[in-house]
Amino acid sequence: VALMTGEVTLLVPRLLQPLVGNSAELALDVGDGATVAQLLDAVAAEFPVFGRRVRDETGELRRFVNIYLDGEDVRRLDGLKTRVAAGQELMVIQSVAGG
C-alpha cells in the first residue's frame, strides 16, 4: 500500500504570525492518516512559542483558540485526533478579549 503524501495549508492569524517567522500561511507536509495534533506538533517543533500559545500543558487546545479544517471547527469533528488529508486547509483563530 502506497502512502499518500502532500501538503496541508495552515493559516496563521496576524497576532501569531511573529511566532512563525511572520508568515500568514505555512505549507505542512502531511502523510496518510495524519492528525491535527501531529501537524501542530510539527509546527511546535520548529516554532515552540507558537505551540505553547495554541495548546496548553496537557496538549489540548487552549480555550481561546479554535482550529478549523476546511471551515469546520475541529472540536465538532474529532478534536485533535481529526484526520487531515493533503489539499485541506487548517485555520487557527485566536480570540482576543479587551476592555
Region spans (language model):
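Ubiquitin-like/PB1-type beta-grasp interaction modules and other compact soluble beta-rich domains
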Residues: 2-98
